[in-house]
């Protein structure tokens, strides 16, 4: 079932020229529920109440977010669509657009809201078109067509009745007004609509509520209470279906997070992707928790109504002492107990799902901490190798501008220059120094390895390099001044 809501239209729309062209989203495969795009304002689409077009999914209530997306004309007079961080996304020409980023649309582009379920096509599939107002006014949502408005509304209500009564068109409802009326749920999410009780369940309630002729009016109130219980049960079944979809999405998200954690080297892009996945997990957990709270509130309401009905029927039984009323009470109690058991079972299922998700998230955190510890261990080992193999024996620091002597020993260029001012022999083997060569390969290797060290070690090495450059510049200036004299 789907429903669309429009803001009140002004009179100038009725006085528009017959051939005025308008932009709209054409519903694929349907001649109704097209969404008009108003050029002078933003057009929001979602299942919430404060949107331009309200759409509700019949297969999964959480398929469409409260404010799913926004359509708007940009400065270049081009239509754009922006995904408002919806759970199931917006797909333009088969590709999902990034959240909070406007995507330019062209005429005949395909716009899909949500994802397909169980191999079925996407429920909300549209095409951007520009047509004459008179040609499409009967197809627009909100009954913009003047002549066909009442007939279209009547047909929609009849279709809703057929859908929720299991195709039994001959089954009468208590009043003419309630034949095809959609009752609002008492849950906090007011955007979901509740159907009338199904034909089979209403027939059962009617048979169970036939009292004696003189007590017919009092028995009718008990049948109405059972009908309310059936509505709660139908809503709970829809919550179960949406929970299965959420559970599948949580599993996919968790699997992706585990794959990212197994990789030792994490780039900033992967870190960001991991954070996005964790954000999605928290959002899904919030939705599961919200549905659990709604189910608990429904169960409490039903238990309260059950107690009130039980007290009322007990009073009537004591006053009238009629066999028919006693039978009605027993059947009503049986129906209430059945509904309460199903609610308790569903609540237990919600609790198990939340516990499983908490456990999976804890495992993910442990794996991430383990990977971090492994990385720190690698850095520690690298530091030990640098300190033991790539240190200058004169200054006990990592080589800075390493040079290799004729005896194959390596030192810092600054250190060996200072040493040769005193002795022209190798500090390690005491051979005469006949040549020294810069080792660029060794310098590059040390520089690349220093990048993975801690910030303190990198800062300390940078200070040493600057100090030695300053000393070299000072000595060169002294030498040049002495030569001029």
Swiss-Prot record:
It holds the Pfam family zf-C3HC4. Keywords: Chromatin regulator, DNA damage, DNA repair, Metal-binding, Nucleus, Transferase, Ubl conjugation pathway, Zinc, Zinc-finger. Residues 221-230 have a biased composition (Low complexity). Pathway: Protein modification; protein ubiquitination. It catalyses: S-ubiquitinyl-[E2 ubiquitin-conjugating enzyme]-L-cysteine + [acceptor protein]-L-lysine = [E2 ubiquitin-conjugating enzyme]-L-cysteine + N(6)-ubiquitinyl-[acceptor protein]-L-lysine. GO terms for cellular component: chromosome, telomeric region; cytosol; nucleus; site of double-strand break; ubiquitin ligase complex. Transmembrane segments: none annotated. Its EC number is 2.3.2.27. It is an enzyme of class 2 (transferase). Gene3D superfamilies: 1.20.5.170, 2.60.200.20, Zinc/RING finger domain, C3HC4 (zinc finger). It is found in: Nucleus. A zinc finger (RING-type) spans 392-430. Its main location: nucleus. The keyword DNA repair applies. Residues 199-219 have a biased composition (Basic and acidic residues). GO terms for biological process: DNA damage response; DNA repair-dependent chromatin remodeling; double-strand break repair; double-strand break repair via nonhomologous end joining; epigenetic regulation of gene expression; isotype switching; negative regulation of transcription elongation by RNA polymerase II; positive regulation of DNA repair. GO terms for molecular function: chromatin binding; histone binding; protein homodimerization activity; ubiquitin binding; ubiquitin protein ligase activity; zinc ion binding. It comes from the Eukaryota. Belongs to the RNF8 family. The FHA domain specifically recognizes and binds ATM-phosphorylated MDC1. PANTHER family: E3 UBIQUITIN-PROTEIN LIGASE RNF8 (PTHR15067:SF4). E3 ubiquitin-protein ligase that plays a key role in DNA damage signaling via 2 distinct roles: by mediating the 'Lys-63'-linked ubiquitination of histones H2A and H2AX and promoting the recruitment of DNA repair proteins at double-strand breaks (DSBs) sites, and by catalyzing 'Lys-48'-linked ubiquitination to remove target proteins from DNA damage sites. Following DNA DSBs, it is recruited to the sites of damage by ATM-phosphorylated mdc1 and catalyzes the 'Lys-63'-linked ubiquitination of histones H2A and H2AX. This is E3 ubiquitin-protein ligase rnf8. It comes from Danio rerio (Zebrafish). The gene is rnf8.
């Amino acid at each position: 079932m789907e429903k669309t809501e429009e803001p009140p239209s002004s009179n100038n729309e009725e006085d528009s020229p017959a051939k005025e062209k308008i932009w709209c989203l054409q519903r694929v495969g349907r001649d109704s529920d097209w969404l008009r795009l108003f050029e002078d304002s933003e057009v929001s689409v979602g299942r919430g109440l404060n949107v331009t077009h309200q759409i509700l999914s019949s297969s999964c209530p959480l398929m469409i977010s409260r404010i799913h997306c926004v359509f708007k004309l940009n400065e270049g007079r081009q239509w754009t669509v922006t995904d408002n961080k919806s759970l199931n996304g917006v797909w333009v020409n088969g590709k999902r657009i990034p959240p909070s980023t406007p995507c330019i649309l062209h005429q005949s582009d395909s716009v899909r809201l949500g994802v397909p379920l169980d191999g079925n096509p996407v429920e909300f599939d549209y095409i951007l078109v520009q047509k004459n107002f008179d040609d499409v006014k009967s197809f627009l949502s909100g009954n913009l067509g003047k002549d066909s408005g009442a007939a279209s509304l009547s047909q929609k209500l009849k279709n809703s009745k057929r859908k929720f009564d299991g195709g039994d068109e001959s089954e009468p409802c208590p009043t003419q007004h309630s034949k095809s009326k959609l009752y609002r749920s008492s849950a906090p999410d007011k955007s979901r609509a509740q159907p009338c009780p199904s034909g089979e369940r209403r027939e059962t309630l009617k048979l169970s509520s036939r009292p004696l002729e003189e007590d017919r009016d009092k028995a009718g109130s008990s049948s109405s209470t059972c009908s309310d219980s059936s509505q709660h049960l139908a809503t709970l079944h829809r919550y179960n279906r949406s929970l299965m979809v959420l559970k599948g999405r949580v599993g996919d998200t968790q699997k992706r997070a585990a794959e990212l954690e197994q990789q030792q080297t994490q780039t900033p892009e992967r870190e960001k992707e991991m954070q996005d996945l964790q954000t999605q997990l928290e959002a899904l957990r919030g939705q599961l928790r919200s549905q659990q709270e709604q189910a608990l509130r429904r169960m409490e309401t039903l238990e309260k109504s059950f107690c009130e009905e039980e007290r009322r029927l007990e009073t009537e039984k004591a006053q009238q002492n009629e066999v028919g009323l006693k039978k009605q009470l027993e059947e009503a109690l049986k129906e209430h107990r059945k509904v309460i058991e199903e609610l308790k079972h569903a609540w237990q299922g919600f609790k198990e799902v939340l516990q499983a998700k908490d456990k999976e998230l804890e495992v993910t955190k442990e794996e991430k901490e383990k990977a971090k510890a492994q990385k720190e261990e690698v850095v520690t080992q690298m530091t030990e190798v640098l300190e033991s193999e790539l240190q200058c024996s004169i200054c006990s620091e990592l080589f800075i501008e390493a040079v290799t002597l004729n005896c194959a020993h390596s030192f810092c260029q600054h250190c060996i220059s200072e040493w040769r001012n005193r002795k022209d022999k190798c500090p390690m083997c005491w051979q005469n120094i006949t040549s020294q060569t810069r080792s660029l390969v060794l310098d590059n290797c040390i520089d690349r390895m220093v990048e993975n060290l801690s910030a303190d070690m990198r800062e300390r090495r940078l200070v040493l390099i600057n100090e030695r450059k300053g000393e070299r510049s000072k000595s060169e200036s002294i030498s040049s001044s002495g030569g001029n004299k």
